[in-house]
Curated annotation (Swiss-Prot):
Gene: MT-CYB
Keyword match tRNA processing: no
One Pfam family per UniProt: Cytochrome_B
Amino acids binding a ubiquinone: 201
Compartments where found: Mitochondrion inner membrane
Other comment: Heme 1 (or BL or b562) is low-potential and absorbs at about 562 nm, and heme 2 (or BH or b566) is high-potential and absorbs at about 566 nm.
GO cellular component: mitochondrial inner membrane; respiratory chain complex III
Sequence positions that bind heme b b562: 83
Complexes and interactors: The cytochrome bc1 complex contains 11 subunits: 3 respiratory subunits (MT-CYB, CYC1 and UQCRFS1), 2 core proteins (UQCRC1 and UQCRC2) and 6 low-molecular weight proteins (UQCRH/QCR6, UQCRB/QCR7, UQCRQ/QCR8, UQCR10/QCR9, UQCR11/QCR10 and a cleavage product of UQCRFS1). This cytochrome bc1 complex then forms a dimer.
Cofactor note: Binds 2 heme b groups non-covalently.
Domain of life assignment: Eukaryota
Protein name: Cytochrome b
Transmembrane segments: 33-53, 77-98, 113-133, 178-198, 226-246, 288-308, 320-340, 347-367
Length: 379
């Protein structure tokens, strides 16, 4: 008799995706981040759901309802901080996952990669609207500044901003709207993640060498399920260390001050995971130019398959490209640091140089280096 998991219509899908899935035998821990992102998503949906049960999306009570969750609700503080720090873990895993894709040439699976970029945009949008909900100073002013960027769009910009605000400033309608988005967006993310997996399983996983591994595949379970469980335990360990010892380490102290439209904080900045994009936005003096650079800093990922000039897929055997890749990582860390600094000398010029370098590495240096490496192969 055939095993039920191979015959039952629903279990067959699960079986083909997580149990009998043929997987390359040499994929490293860099391939763990997909499952970790799944865990983060489920964690965020669950903690978010429990927070929503006690949250009030009214400008007069939003801030105090979050305080109420932390003080009066059973284990409310741990749910709140797991949600806040879970977002940070989500983005750490996301950046590692995208970095892995860039390093090992996974972007050559076009459909999977493009859905992944759409997923990245959706997660960033969800994190942004979610950050507005506690209605602290940084929530309010972050919402005002970032939504106001849309006014740079010619002709329809101003109308678009007022439509998102639900009036002529960030107010009750904005908060209610922004409470509706983090409710629906995670489910859209879940659907996109399923499509992402569907496309991935059409081609099979890439591997560190970038060489087709059809001759050497092993079943996903038990080899990689046990590996994913270890990754999950490490993720939960780091998350709980953050939550239980330094829950406010990655937050902004200004967000413990209730939102006040009459008092602008001295330095408006988003959460740490948006700082690199914020630094690129600020490095351009023109409003529309800054917005375009901000969008392009992420959208540039779509171009990666077109910019791939190497005869080899992975960077495993390309030392010059490896060097460039790590310079790019250092540049992104520099941008993240600059995004959190005030707009003054020398931070402004460092931010501008780092922004130019970011685009220059991806659009110019990487393709040229790949072509040089191709020629070196002939020797």
């Amino acid at each position: 008799m055939t095993n039920i998991r191979k015959t039952h219509p629903l279990m067959k899908i699960v079986n083909n995706a997580f149990i009998d899935l043929p997987t390359p035998s040499n994929i490293s821990s860099w391939w763990n981040f997909g499952s970790l992102l799944g865990i983060c998503l489920v964690l965020q949906i669950l903690t978010g759901l429990f927070l929503a049960m006690h949250y009030s999306s009214d400008t007069t009570t939003a801030f105090s309802s979050v305080t109420h969750i932390c003080r009066d609700v059973n284990y409310g503080w741990i749910i709140r901080y797991m949600h806040a720090n879970g977002a940070s873990m989500f983005f750490i895993c996301l950046f590692m996952h995208v970095g892995r894709g860039l390093y090992y040439g996974s972007y050559n699976y076009l459909e999977t990669w493009n859905i992944g970029v759409i997923l990245l945009f959706t997660v960033m949008a969800t994190a942004f609207v979610g950050y507005v909900l506690p209605w602290g100073q940084m929530s309010f002013w972050g919402a005002t500044v970032i939504t106001n960027l849309l006014s740079a769009i010619p002709y329809i910009g101003t109308n678009l901003v007022e439509w998102i605000w639900g009036g002529f400033s960030v107010d009750k309608a904005t908060l209610t709207g922004f409470f509706a988005f983090p409710f629906i967006l995670p489910f859209i993310i879940m659907a996109l993640a399923m499509i992402h997996l569907l496309f991935l399983h059409e081609t099979g996983s890439n591997n560190p060498t970038g060489i087709p591994s059809d001759t050497d595949k092993i079943p996903f379970h038990p080899y990689y399920t046990i590996k994913d469980i270890l990754g999950a335990l490490i993720l939960i360990l780091f998350l709980m260390l953050l939550v239980l010892f330094t829950p406010d380490l990655l937050g902004d102290p200004d967000n413990y001050t209730p939102a006040n439209p009459l008092n602008t904080p001295p330095h408006i900045k988003p959460e740490w995971y948006f700082l690199f994009a914020y630094a690129i936005l600020r490095s351009i003096p023109n409003k529309l130019g800054g917005v375009l650079a901000l969008v392009l800093s992420i959208l540039i990922l779509i171009l990666m398959p077109l910019l791939h000039m190497s005869k080899q897929r992975s960077m495993m055997f390309r030392p010059f490209s490896q060097c460039l890749f790590w310079i790019l990582v250092a540049d992104l860390l520099t941008l993240t640091w600059i995004g959190g600094q005030p707009v003054e000398h020398p931070f402004t010029i460092i931010g501008q140089l780092a922004s130019i370098l970011y685009f220059f590495i991806i659009l110019v240096l990487m393709p040229i280096t790949s072509m040089i490496e191709n020629n070196l192969l002939k020797w």
